[in-house]
Amino acid sequence: METLIASLDDAPIIDKDGYEYLVHPISNGVPMLDPALLREVVVELMQTAELDVDKIVTPEAMGIHLSTALSLQTDIPLVVIRKRAYGLDGEVSLHQQTGYSESEMYINDVEAGDRVLVVDDLLSTGGTLAAICASLSDIGAEIADVVVVLRKVGPSALDDTEFEVTSLLDITVEDGEVLVH
């Protein structure tokens, strides 16, 4: 995890209406994502996540690069929860709300009885992951594990749910600095 921790030291922090926003290659795609960082994160995901699953499920957009690399390494099929409806048979709509946005997302190719691993880049407010996990449960999928690379320590929409999230690193952003816990 040395590369990931070092990358946090170099990550810009920008002010968005009084909110200290971490800009990081894993969670934003900028600054440029170094292959060594992606490799380290995927190896750690492979060692941390429950991989006895039928599918890896990830939300668009910043979970895609992580989950694609994980899928390539494990041969587990990948399902991307999209921000656009395609109108395919069995498509399920979900409403997600975070601390800074609100939108619809769409799940395809997950069916009752599927055992799934949910992977995402960052858990901040928990709105996206809470909505995804609730929708997957409503479909009848078994959520074997939920793993994120970074978790911002603090209250989350997942706190009062049955869903537990494992993170590779827990962080806070204070006074323009990232602190690893």
Curated annotation (Swiss-Prot):
Q: Give the enzyme's EC designation.
A: 2.4.2.-
PROSITE patterns, per database record:
PUR_PYR_PR_TRANSFER
Q: Which InterPro entries match?
A: HGPRTase-like, PRibTrfase_dom, PRTase-like, Pur/Pyrimidine_PRTase
Gene Ontology biological process: purine ribonucleoside salvage
The protein's UniProt keywords, in alphabetical order, are:
Purine salvage, Transferase
Q: Which GO terms describe its molecular function?
A: transferase activity
Instruction: Name the enzyme's class.
Output: transferase
Please list every transmembrane segment annotated in the UniProt record, as residue ranges.
none
Known function: May catalyze a purine salvage reaction, the substrate is unknown.
**The name this protein goes by in its record:** HGPRTase-like protein 1
Q: Which organism is it from?
A: Halalkalicoccus jeotgali (strain DSM 18796 / CECT 7217 / JCM 14584 / KCTC 4019 / B3)
